């Protein structure tokens, strides 16, 4: 039998009403558009559009 170990590098994702988390679980690898948004977030957040602030 093979024992699967848990990866504790990222927080565990649990959907609970008393401790809400975002709908999207934490991701290990960002897409190109997500990386671009992360770089844009390093500047002033007032330059972000409303859609970018929601993402």
UniProtKB/Swiss-Prot annotation:
It comes from the Eukaryota. It is found in: Mitochondrion inner membrane. The modification N6-acetyllysine is found at residues 4, 35, 42. GO terms for biological process: mitochondrial electron transport, cytochrome c to oxygen. The keyword Transmembrane helix applies. Component of the cytochrome c oxidase (complex IV, CIV), a multisubunit enzyme composed of 14 subunits. The complex is composed of a catalytic core of 3 subunits MT-CO1, MT-CO2 and MT-CO3, encoded in the mitochondrial DNA, and 11 supernumerary subunits COX4I, COX5A, COX5B, COX6A, COX6B, COX6C, COX7A, COX7B, COX7C, COX8 and NDUFA4, which are encoded in the nuclear genome. Pathway: Energy metabolism; oxidative phosphorylation. It comes from Sapajus apella (Brown-capped capuchin). The modification Phosphoserine is found at residues 31, 33. Keywords: Acetylation, Membrane, Mitochondrion, Mitochondrion inner membrane, Phosphoprotein, Transmembrane, Transmembrane helix. This is Cytochrome c oxidase subunit 4 isoform 1, mitochondrial. The gene is COX4I1. GO terms for cellular component: mitochondrial inner membrane; respiratory chain complex IV. Residues 32-55 are annotated as: Disordered. It is a single-pass membrane protein. The keyword Kinase does not apply. Disulfide bonds: none annotated. InterPro entries: Cyt_c_oxidase_su4_fam (IPR004203), Cyt_c_oxidase_su4_sf (IPR036639). The modification N6-succinyllysine is found at residues 4, 35. Component of the cytochrome c oxidase, the last enzyme in the mitochondrial electron transport chain which drives oxidative phosphorylation. The respiratory chain contains 3 multisubunit complexes succinate dehydrogenase (complex II, CII), ubiquinol-cytochrome c oxidoreductase (cytochrome b-c1 complex, complex III, CIII) and cytochrome c oxidase (complex IV, CIV), that cooperate to transfer electrons derived from NADH and succinate to molecular oxygen, creating an electrochemical gradient over the inner membrane that drives transmembrane transport and the ATP synthase. It holds the Pfam family COX4. Belongs to the cytochrome c oxidase IV family.
